[in-house]
From Swiss-Prot:
This is Ras and Rab interactor 1. Its main location: cytoplasm. Belongs to the RIN (Ras interaction/interference) family. It comes from Homo sapiens (Human). Pfam families: RA, RIN1, VPS9. Residues 69-163 form the SH2 domain. GO terms for biological process: endocytosis; signal transduction. Residues 456-598 form the VPS9 domain. Ras effector protein, which may serve as an inhibitory modulator of neuronal plasticity in aversive memory formation. Can affect Ras signaling at different levels. First, by competing with RAF1 protein for binding to activated Ras. Second, by enhancing signaling from ABL1 and ABL2, which regulate cytoskeletal remodeling. Third, by activating RAB5A, possibly by functioning as a guanine nucleotide exchange factor (GEF) for RAB5A, by exchanging bound GDP for free GTP, and facilitating Ras-activated receptor endocytosis.
Amino acid sequence: MESPGESGAGSPGAPSPSSFTTGHLAREKPAQDPLYDVPNASGGQAGGPQRPGRVVSLRERLLLTRPVWLQLQANAAAALHMLRTEPPGTFLVRKSNTRQCQALCMRLPEASGPSFVSSHYILESPGGVSLEGSELMFPDLVQLICAYCHTRDILLLPLQLPRAIHHAATHKELEAISHLGIEFWSSSLNIKAQRGPAGGPVLPQLKARSPQELDQGTGAALCFFNPLFPGDLGPTKREKFKRSFKVRVSTETSSPLSPPAVPPPPVPVLPGAVPSQTERLPPCQLLRRESSVGYRVPAGSGPSLPPMPSLQEVDCGSPSSSEEEGVPGSRGSPATSPHLGRRRPLLRSMSAAFCSLLAPERQVGRAAAALMQDRHTAAGQLVQDLLTQVRAGPEPQELQGIRQALSRARAMLSAELGPEKLLSPKRLEHVLEKSLHCSVLKPLRPILAARLRRRLAADGSLGRLAEGLRLARAQGPGAFGSHLSLPSPVELEQVRQKLLQLLRTYSPSAQVKRLLQACKLLYMALRTQEGEGAGADEFLPLLSLVLAHCDLPELLLEAEYMSELLEPSLLTGEGGYYLTSLSASLALLSGLGQAHTLPLSPVQELRRSLSLWEQRRLPATHCFQHLLRVAYQDPSSGCTSKTLAVPPEASIATLNQLCATKFRVTQPNTFGLFLYKEQGYHRLPPGALAHRLPTTGYLVYRRAEWPETQGAVTEEEGSGQSEARSRGEEQGCQGDGDAGVKASPRDIREQSETTAEGGQGQAQEGPAQPGEPEAEGSRAAEE
């Protein structure tokens, strides 16, 4: 497909200056004016030469194919029809039929329920867009779709692009799909993509070569490149060696593997080496493959070749490679033990397999760190602004704000990074969380710890804990009402070392890991004393006793640090349980120093600690104190009730208008607010305050012409409010009598029968005393 005005412009070999300028501007501003890779008549691309091997990002795929997945004219039935044959996770966005917003429709698995399509409303606000029920907010719809392609959050499973869009390699193919619009869902292109098998990337096959070909290489060795990342090589030889783990397989019958004289590449040939004997071996004995690893060193005897490099010399991505010690032996020396030499090939084979699996995580971590350093990206701007804001000064609920920012940044990073990293969504979230801790919490750790220490020292928490630790050491197990004894000195020192590691760690997840290790050591010591039947009732006193002898008041800071910054999903698991146990134990120790106060039992202290923690997590109580529940009586629809948010100083007149709006009353002048109390309705004056009414009644919004005695409720209650004598009340209620009418028992019984289904229906009220003239006048007026 040619763009108008582009065919025939310039020679076939050289693009015109105008097309070059257009392509340059398009590369400068891809987000504002995307230029598609449409070929011109010469076979080139109108948008300028595209870099070979360039991967189209997920955001570009969504932007170019917006007419396919954004169907604002489609209704719910059309969405069901288009998604009925699609694989689970396929989605489209339509306009809601019942609400003024857009809806995200997603195909569900067959066994998920009666409906195979779920709809989620997309809410728009000044801060961005978000799904209904989710706390994640994004700047635009495309960013939201990108994020939910990698993380499901409230969805049943992550979103998935149609296969034709996902496998498109160039902008030209995506533009061709975009031109189809809604017809893409029923086109042959989509059907062909569905019927075809879901093939993964074609990996390069290892080809067995003859001994003559192998001898042409340096040191008669075969190089095996890691096929997981064939196109991710760096510009230098050292970078190539880092990115592609090379394994040299010996062609001799015996090859004890030991550290080489010089790290490869290249592999030097040792002087005086015995000539290769592979020419006398059949090719089938050259290399025996295993399906689990991919290579195996043949057994036998023969001269040794230059040894393999150790894992420490190869940057294979193992997280523990920098912490392990080197392989014993000097350079160029053979293995010191024949038994160790026989085991090394298998160990190195297993290590190579693990390194290949861990390499994607290192790549994701490096990519996430680069994005967080770049202010031009959404995640980078959020992270850098967060660092600047925290360093500027303390704020209320600072740790909770940091945790929310980390969750938002993780969703943005998940949307930025493509799915080609060979990581599952759950593993991707774990790697991104770890990268965020390194980029955000590591530099902020000293600042946050100093602020926590100042705050806890100012309110006396640290002082009370230090005094409680001293008393617990002096009193022993009797301070907690327990007969348990301390673990052995060796076990106590092991627990102390784990707690010291916890204090030196900046990541909350790593701190919880150290806490679990310490608690495991304590459980082992507890079972040694009490047997297998020991439980939480014995564990909490033992934990408090061990903490007292470790004498680490700084654990109070770390308990709050972990509780606020730990990922919310981890708080409900084993880590959250033992973190709560640590907080309860510290609270129990802090209470020992208070004079004339008996220490609570472990169970009571645990409940109190949980209550305090929930108070920090839940919103304040005053947020719910401005709510009033009003019942609505109507002859046609019966009785309904609603909870209304009323300002503190709102009057009854304001509440009347609010009720008329909420209950959709067509004639609000004929309705009024009444207080149902003592089997009677009392008309409320317009000037009374809504939040200062008697609490022993029910607010009812009903027709004002129903029978009632004249007057104001304030006279019966004796409050003496001046609003009862206002002009508006005199117009609404003629007379100065009682404002409430007492219903007869028969009428009350009839009313209870009409309102038996959950509401107060229309009440046919009679006079309390038939002989009273005011009641008879009211009945006559009603007739």
